[in-house]
Amino acid sequence: MQKVIFLLVLFFFTHNLFAKEEYFLTLGNEKVNLRQGPSFDYPVKIFYKKKFLPVLIQDKSDTFRKIRDHENNSGWIHISQLSKKKAALTIDDDVLVFNKPTIYSTPKVILKKGRLCKIKKCKDEWCNITVDKFKGWVKKDSLWGLL
């Protein structure tokens, strides 16, 4: 019985060590190919034309990363086409950008769904963003591209 308990405990602790960790990166160029497999030999599935578009990294194979975008498209992108710059997309209509990280501060602008925001920093449930010439704070749960 002790062996069974020991093996179960060992399984649960080592399982977490080998779990794949997902994280976000952004597209590093204006033109990026999403391929069906982890090589230049695979055909292009999607041609992205939006620099800093956030993508979720799900797996890796040598110099390629398997990604998923905000529309659930998945495929492989070469690491030279990815950037560590922080950005996110608004996932709700009429996202308010506030002067300070509180709903009681002055709203500065309203963003529509799908708007690309550069992330300066996040603090608790708020993120300081820049969109065009506007800067301010938005609720973290209204953004896609952050963990």
What residues fall within each predicted segment?
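SH3-family beta-barrel domains
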Residues: 18-36, 46-51, 58-100, 104-133, ...
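Second-shell loop/turn segments in exported
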Residues: 38-42
